[in-house]
Curated annotation (Swiss-Prot):
It is found in: Cytoplasm. Pfam families: SMC_N (PF02463). ATP binds at G30, H31, N32, G33, S34, G35, K36, T37. GO terms for biological process: DNA replication; DNA synthesis involved in DNA repair; double-strand break repair; SOS response. It comes from Shewanella amazonensis (strain ATCC BAA-1098 / SB2B). This is DNA replication and repair protein RecF. The keyword ATP-binding applies. Belongs to the RecF family.
Length: 360
C-alpha cells in the first residue's frame, strides 16, 4: 500500500497542498513550525479519522475555514483506491472510499495501515498499559477479521456490567452479562496472545540489529491471573467490583511487558535505546502485517535524527527501507537524512510557512 497522490486543504497551517509521493522514501524538510509535521498528521488523519497530536480534532481545521478536506489515491495489489475525508468544525465527518460513503472509521484503518514514529512515541513505554493495548490491538485488528467485532462486543458488555455495578445490582443480574463477557473476552485474549507470539518472532531479529548487547524479553499479560479461570474470577471479585463501581480484571487490563533482566525496559535503557526499541516494535508490526496479509504499512517518521547518533540513524533508516514500505520522513535539514541513506530519497518536499514544494 502506498499513496501516489495526496491533497490537503485547510489543515493546520496548510491552506492547500498537492503532493505526488514516491513509493519509497519521501523526505519532507523545513524549519520548525513550517508545516512538515502537519503533512504526516494529515496522512494519519486520513487513515484514522483523528490526529496523533490532539484528541480535539477541531483544532486541526484552519481558523478561517469551516472544514478540512483530505484526499489520496492509494495504490495496492488489488488496484487503486480513492480515499476522501471532510471534517466539519461541528465535528461531523464525511468519508468516502471509491465514491462509497464509509460508516465506520475502522474501514479507513483497514484501507490505510499506518505506523507512526515521533518523539512522542515514548508514550508506548511510559503512559501505562492503555498505549500498549492499542499497539497490540492495531496488529490484532489487521491480523484477524474476528477481532474488531469481538473487542467491540467486549467493550459494550463491560460498559453494561460497570453500570450495573454502579447501580448496586445483585450478582444474579450481572451473571447474565458475565456469560457473554467471558465468551468475547476469551476470543479477544486468544487473538491478542497469538498476535504477540507472532510479533515476538519478527521482533527478535530487529532488536538484535538495533541493540545486540541487550537481552529484551517481551510478554503478553491478559488482564487477569493466568492460573485463574475468568468465570470464577468474575464471581469471586464481585464484591470488590461492586465496592469500587467497575470491573477490576479482564481484557481491558491487558498489557505488553518489556523487560531487561528484572527491570522494566524503561528503567533499564537510555533514552536513545528506548527510541530504538519503540522503532523496532513499529518496524516489526509492519513486517508482520506484510507476512500475514501481504499488505505494506505506511510509515510516518517525524524528527528521526532526535537522540540518535549517525550510526544508529543509518541503521534505523536501513531497517525502514528494507521493509519495502512507503516512508514519509521529516527533518529540519535534508542532509541529516540524505547523508545516512544508501541511495537518494524517491521524493523530496520543502515546506515553508505551510507551502509545499517538490524539490526532487
Amino acid at each position: 500500500m502506498s499513496l501516489s497522490r495526496l491533497s490537503i486543504d485547510a489543515f493546520r497551517n496548510i491552506d492547500s497542498a498537492q503532493l505526488a509521493p514516491g513509493a519509497g522514501l519521501n523526505l519532507i524538510y523545513g524549519h520548525n513550525g513550517s508545516g512538515k509535521t502537519s503533512i504526516l498528521e494529515a496522512i494519519y488523519f486520513l487513515g484514522m479519522g483523528r490526529s496523533f497530536r490532539s484528541h480535539l480534532s477541531q483544532r486541526v481545521i484552519q481558523n478561517d475555514a469551516d472544514c478540512l478536506t483530505l484526499f489520496a489515491v492509494a495504490e495496492g495489489q488489488a488496484g487503486d483506491s480513492r480515499i476522501g475525508l471532510r471534517r466539519h468544525r461541528s465535528g461531523d465527518t464525511e468519508v468516502k472510499i471509491d465514491g462509497e460513503k464509509v460508516k465506520r472509521l475502522s474501514q479507513l484503518a483497514e484501507a490505510l495501515p499506518i505506523q507512526v514514529i515521533t518523539p512522542e512515541s515514548f508514550s508506548l513505554l511510559f503512559e501505562g498499559p492503555s498505549a500498549r493495548r492499542q499497539f497490540i490491538d492495531w496488529g490484532a485488528f489487521h491480523a484477524s477479521k474476528q477481532f474488531h467485532l469481538a473487542w467491540m462486543n467486549t467493550r459494550r458488555i463491560l460498559k453494561q456490567r460497570n453500570q450495573l455495578l454502579r447501580d448496586g445490582a445483585s450478582y444474579e443480574h450481572i451473571a447474565f452479562w458475565d456469560k457473554e463477557l467471558i465468551r468475547y473476552a476469551l476470543e479477544v485474549t486468544a487473538i491478542r496472545n497469538d498476535y504477540v507470539g507472532s510479533l515476538n518472532g519478527v521482533l527478535k531479529g530487529i532488536i538484535g540489529e538495533f541493540l545486540p548487547d541487550v537481552d529484551i524479553r517481551v510478554s503478553f499479560t491478559r488482564g487477569w491471573d493466568s492460573k485463574t479461570d475468568f468465570s470464577e474470577l468474575l464471581q469471586s471479585q464481585y464484591a470488590r467490583d461492586l465496592a469500587i463501581g467497575h470491573t477490576v480484571s479482564g481484557p481491558h487490563k491487558a498489557d505488553l511487558r518489556l523487560r531487561v533482566g528484572n527491570l522494566p525496559a524503561q528503567d533499564a535503557l537510555s533514552r536513545g535505546q528506548l527510541k530504538l526499541l519503540v522503532c523496532a516494535l513499529r518496524i516489526a508490526q509492519g513486517k508482520l502485517l506484510k507476512q500475514q496479509i501481504d499488505k505494506h504499512s505506511i510509515y510516518l517518521v517525524d524528527d528521526l535524527p532526535s537522540e540518535l547518533d549517525a550510526k544508529h540513524r543509518q541503521l534505523l533508516l536501513k531497517e525502514l527501507i528494507d521493509t519495502g514500505a512507503q516512508l514519509f520522513v521529516t527533518a529540519i535539514e535534508p542532509s541529516a537524512i540524505v547523508d545516512s541513506l544508501p541511495v537518494p530519497p524517491d521524493r523530496m518536499f520543502h515546506v515553508q510557512a505551510g507551502r509545499v514544494t517538490q524539490t526532487k
